[in-house]
């Protein structure tokens, strides 16, 4: 890996100089001066997905400098390292091989002198056989009833990803009721337990380490609830399953060895939906649709690996993101799926991006003096239009946005989808081109308002525009297309981290809070005080404890 700070490259200096020239150019002028702009700055993926990046504040020259940055930092070598199984997660000494889980060509991937595809295929076969038994009613609960409810207990990647995909592919869902429990707040589990019957429910305990406090606490409570009804430890074999790399801990919990679906340390948690952690997805949509989901991701993997810099969608989107965070000074990026089934998509990539690239130390162990990962947020359209779009249109911040929409809806109710897609098109147009003073003045004059009213209201109606967007139009949200879309964003995040000279596959910042939490829990629970707390924390603890007397 080339461990160079990107702001020490010639490309960075070129971009810095170039930015001074174009920072005030308006998108109106960029489109007016180039009638082929859309054609030049858009790519179609497999005739299923259009990526339009023409409404970005870039020129042909910008793109040349950005692509030079990718070449100078040797992104293609980084891609090859990841796909080959090199241990690019240096701080944990691990390979990063979620791409192996969707390697549909069965190309051998050698790790520690073993072809890991043999294990991957064996796991997929085990998941397939189990899911078919559950879906077809052949897997019985302890009283002989077929399974109707599936409860996935996990957090982070073991929850956000599977939950997002299950919701996004709800049109492909079978009869099984899917529930997801993540929060250690007892309310989350309690509300799910109210809805289910222990006789026809299975629990999937999704934890790579099988030590995650939130997950194991919820799992123990679910187990206690279940045994209250079954009154027999052996009945756990019919109802509890582990999706984990830690076989020993799963066995100690009481999970039957045959009920453990393996995980590997080369699969990062936030990429785990492709692994056994995706069992809830398979149970929801069936094995055939899950295979199509993997196929779509694999197709994007091939595009990412084989396509040149200039036409490589993840590379282009990553470069454009870096352009805004490090030259325009934008702090956030928004993702707006115009599809209600995709309502958890933004939240999933909030975790995936911010946990991956929320770093301030470079790969050489030195503090960074430039911006790394942006803050990711978003909601489905059109809800967001009536909540926060106002700030994007007329606020003081530059917020690059991704708009995602299907051409065909799964629920084309009357003319609902045409109205939805009209909003999609209108918002990207309004953000790019705005509404100038002259056009507003003309409309106000035509409305026959008096001069005083026009003068008073005119400044407030101006929308400056020049807000950048990417538009991603997908023929339909199918398992295949969703798989490709998720892989696109995953690879975009990888490229960003690689260029920014950070390790994208660890999350040490998450660990500190866990450690402190355990110390405080010991103090609250058994009055063991391991250390002195700051005045604020001490005051908060004392206030809490005053109610426990």
From Swiss-Prot:
**Care to name a GO molecular-function term for this sequence?**
glucose-6-phosphate isomerase activity
- Provide a GO CC annotation, any one: cytosol
Q: Please list the GO biological process terms of this entry.
A: gluconeogenesis; glucose 6-phosphate metabolic process; glycolytic process
Superkingdom of origin: Bacteria
UniProt lists the family membership as follows: Belongs to the GPI family.
According to its UniProt entry, the function of this protein is described as:
Catalyzes the reversible isomerization of glucose-6-phosphate to fructose-6-phosphate.
Q: What is the protein name for this chain?
A: Glucose-6-phosphate isomerase
The species this protein was found in:
Buchnera aphidicola subsp. Acyrthosiphon pisum (strain 5A)
Give the organism's phylogenetic lineage.
Bacteria, Pseudomonadati, Pseudomonadota, Gammaproteobacteria, Enterobacterales
Q: Which gene encodes it?
A: pgi
């Amino acid at each position: 890996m080339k461990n160079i700070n990107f702001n020490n490259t010639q490309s960075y200096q070129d971009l810095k100089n170039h930015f001074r020239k174009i920072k005030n150019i308006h998108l109106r002028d960029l489109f007016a001066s180039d009638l082929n702009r859309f054609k030049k700055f858009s790519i179609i993926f497999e005739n299923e997905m259009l990526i339009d990046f023409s409404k970005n504040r870039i020129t042909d020259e910008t793109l040349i400098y950005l692509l030079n940055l990718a070449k100078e930092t040797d992104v293609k070598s980084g891609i090859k390292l990841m796909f080959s199984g090199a241990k690019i997660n240096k701080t944990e000494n691990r390979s990063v091989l979620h791409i192996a889980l969707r390697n549909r060509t069965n190309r051998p991937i050698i790790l520690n002198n073993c072809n890991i595809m043999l294990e991957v295929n064996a796991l997929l076969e085990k998941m397939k056989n189990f899911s078919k038994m559950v879906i077809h009613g052949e897997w019985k609960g302890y009283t002989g009833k077929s399974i109707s409810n599936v409860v996935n207990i996990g957090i982070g990647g073991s929850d956000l990803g599977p939950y997002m995909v299950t919701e996004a592919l709800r049109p492909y869902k079978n009869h099984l009721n899917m529930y997801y429990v993540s929060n250690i707040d007892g309310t989350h589990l309690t509300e799910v337990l109210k809805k289910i019957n222990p006789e026809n429910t299975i629990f999937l305990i999704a934890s790579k380490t099988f030590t995650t406090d939130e997950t194991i606490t919820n799992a123990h409570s679910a187990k206690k609830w279940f045994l209250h009804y079954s009154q027999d430890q052996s009945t756990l074999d019919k109802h509890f399953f582990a999706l984990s790399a830690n076989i020993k801990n799963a066995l100690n919990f009481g999970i039957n060895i045959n009920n453990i679906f393996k995980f590997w340390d080369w699969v990062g948690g936030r990429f785990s939906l492709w692994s056994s952690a995706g069992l809830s997805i398979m149970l929801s949509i069936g094995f055939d649709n899950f295979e199509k989901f993997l196929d779509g991701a694999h197709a994007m993997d091939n595009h990412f690996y084989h396509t040149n810099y200039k036409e490589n969608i993840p590379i282009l989107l990553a470069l454009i993101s870096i352009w805004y965070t490090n030259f325009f000074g934008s702090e956030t990026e928004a993702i707006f799926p115009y599809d209600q089934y995709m309502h958890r998509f933004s939240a999933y990539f909030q975790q995936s991006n911010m946990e991956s690239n929320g770093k301030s130390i470079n790969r050489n162990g030195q503090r960074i003096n430039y911006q790394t990962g942006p803050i990711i947020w978003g909601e489905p359209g059109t809800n967001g239009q009536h909540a926060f779009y106002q700030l994007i249109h007329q606020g003081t911040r530059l917020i690059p946005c991704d708009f995602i929409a299907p051409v065909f809806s799964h629920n084309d109710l009357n003319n609902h989808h045409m109205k939805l897609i009209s909003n999609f098109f209108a918002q990207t147009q309004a953000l790019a081109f705005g509404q100038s003073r002259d056009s507003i003045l003309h409309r106000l004059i035509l409305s026959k308002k008096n001069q005083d009213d026009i003068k008073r209201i005119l400044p407030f109606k101006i929308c400056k525009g020049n807000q950048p967007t990417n538009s991603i139009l997908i023929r339909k949200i199918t398992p295949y297309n969703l798989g490709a879309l998720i892989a696109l964003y995953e690879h975009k995040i990888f490229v960003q981290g690689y260029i920014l000279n950070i390790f994208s596959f660890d999350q040490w910042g998450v660990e500190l809070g866990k450690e402190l939490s355990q110390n405080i829990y010991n103090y609250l629970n058994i009055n063991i005080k391991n250390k002195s707390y700051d005045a604020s924390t001490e005051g908060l603890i004392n206030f809490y404890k005053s109610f426990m007397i």
